Amino acid sequence: MGDARGGDAHGGPGGPSGPNGPNGPNGDGPGGDGDGPDGDGPNGDRSGIGICCSGGGIRSAAFALGGLQSLDAAGVLRRADHLAAVSGGSYTASAYAITSRYSDPEALEGQRPFAPGSPEEAWVRNHCSYLTNSARDTLRLVGVAAIGLLANLVFFTALLWTVARPLGWLYAWWQPDLRVSGECTAGASPETAWGNGCYAPVGLTGLGPWLLAAGGLALGGLLLALGVRMFQPGWPLRQTLRRVALVLVAVGAAVAFFAWALPELIVFTRNVLGGEPETGPVTESTGVGSSSDKGGANLGFIATVGGAATLAALVVQVGGTLRRAAVTGGRVVARATTRLERLSGGLRRVANTLVGAVIGPLALAAGALFILNGGAQGAHPRTGELLLWAVMALLTGAMLWFADVTAWSLHPLYKWRLSRTFAVARVVGEDGGVTAAPVPYERLLHMSDLTPEQFPGHRPGAPVFPELLVCASANVSDQGTTPPGRSSVSFVFGPRRIGYPRAVDVPRKVPWWRWLLYPAQTEQDTVRFGPLEGPTRDYERVVGERRRRDITISAAVAMSGAAVAPSMGKMTRAPLRFLLALTNVRLGVWLPNPANVPQSSSVPVNPRQIRLLYEVVGRNRVRSTFLYVTDGGHIENLGLLELLRRRCRTVVCLDAAGGSTTSFSTLGEAISLAASELDVRVDIDPAEALRSLDDGRRINDGDTVEGTITYPDGTTGRLIYGKALVTPRSPWDVRAYAAKDGRFPATPTGDQAFSGETFDAYQALGRHVGRACAERVTGAATGNPSAAASPSAAADVVLRAETQATA
């Protein structure tokens, strides 16, 4: 099996022994150090400490802020080799990196970046409701979403006009009875309309040969498939005959659809939606015609219903946010909304499935049928009609060829909102005072500028800040590239390398006819393609100035937090793809494939509009010019996998991924993935050490636990796991807030509009958990300002606070 990049399967760049293979110097197997010069494992000369911060939106960002503050105070952060972060965790991790790298050096004297009480900490806290911090922000968000939706509707409308209108003209030429007489005008009396033949029945002619051909093709395919099943010819002839049978049935169905079903649908449309003489013939002489005008209105009604259903689905999706808003209006409204939400769980699922899988495509099909019907009404296209079609065709071509499919998605706005909150530096003002200010958005903060040696104050053996790894995922749909249900690979933005460090198996490229006629050979003939990564600085150079803005630090963080998109790795919901793509609910980004960087001097300027159609159908090919990159949580939501890939000896994991406070599925998924992909074993049991006290008040027995890491070569390490849990030893103010807020410490990720009080509670909890993790790393207590409390005392605190809240 050869290497798609020109190397041998065992000795090429992507092979096991090649430089990028698992056993090569840059690989992730036992023979490599995980990231070439960045390695920190047994072959590296650094501390071997890695820190990872989980995803979870602003909840995780606040928790990670407190955790990193404690780790920094204990000296663990600056000693670490890698800081891996996902989604919300990357908000804070990138903020730490940007402040450390781009602040005025004199402003940092005497106080570490993001130390408690620092100006940048206050900045982030004051802007923690980063998406909609004001009515102006909300209006802008709605406006951007509306413009994106309009752009999508314009594209689909132009595409339908370009394809369906000429097909209608063809039907008018082939079936004269579909034409509408010029004497059938709007407002004509019934007698005149009858006399002019406006309601004459349609006689579809010449269908016999076409239907005979369609039936013959389909019957031949079925008989061939039956013969293959009964007589079992040898392999691979069996697969070829099955494919031929499938092709015959498909061609027969297509002939029947275009020759008979589609003309009948046109007539059916006129019958059902009709009512005016200017629409021409129908199937029965009932005096009821079909109206292009009324038909358009009815089809518009269908589209309106689809839009209303879409809105309903989105409303029930954000029901939690609406409930929280209702709380501020009164306890009665809040309780009523809560009961409504309890009843809407099933309706939510039905609405999502109905809108995504039925109404959206049906509305689009209805629009296509309306355009097709209009083209079938005239003997010849009118001049205005031809001009309109030409405009639509030019618009479709221009959008397909020149438009940037990322430009009108929600990603640019999301990236900007994150940047203005978390891309902050400490500066010396004109008055000599120290303050925090956002880094100008137009300034490109390159990932390649974050290598540890580039940080101010760095000295050999005395690092200032670890290497930042922003963890996202690249969606892939090639069969056999990933296990079923995963549909993505890790995609990491690092200062030295970007992408996925492994090669993958993909079918060899063959001519279409060979793929069609010889499926057995083509499916088994695979090649190694990759690795899907490249040097970050080379990647930034090759992608060009326009695309370079898509791989800045803020862009990487936005992609790491791109939680909603048509393709979402293991979280993909196929029925929702159409809905999300059509309504422009797209946070993912099409990035140039890093695997192509060594062979390219440049890449296409834009990911073209055709990729919106790829999003609709979930087409994400590994060999594509662009990869669709989304939330890191779509493959692994802790960042733990990337630290194990780099063979860290001591790993601190800060988990605020949310979910239940009594289960640890996020950690379990990460450990399972590390075992299957890296052959790294982790022995840990958080369920026992962090068990719930089962008093109904969200109190757990602990918040940190330690496990053992075993690498393939037998080298061992430590996993120190800290989770956002309230325990009897948590600070009293955290326990009091938990009594007040029934969702704490697992506020739903859909709530990104934190108040300062909620942000402070998660930060304080993170600071407490981070301190406990730091003590395990250093082996010495660093002090705990909160007095330990017994489980019963903690329960009493919660009970008293809840009693006061409901009094």
Question: Model-flagged regions — what are they?
Answer:
Residues M1-G2, V315:
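Accessory "access/gating" subregions that flank catalytic or transport cores
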Residues D3, D8-D45, S790:
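Asp/Glu-rich intrinsically disordered low-complexity tracts
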Residues G44-A807:
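Patatin-like phospholipase A catalytic core
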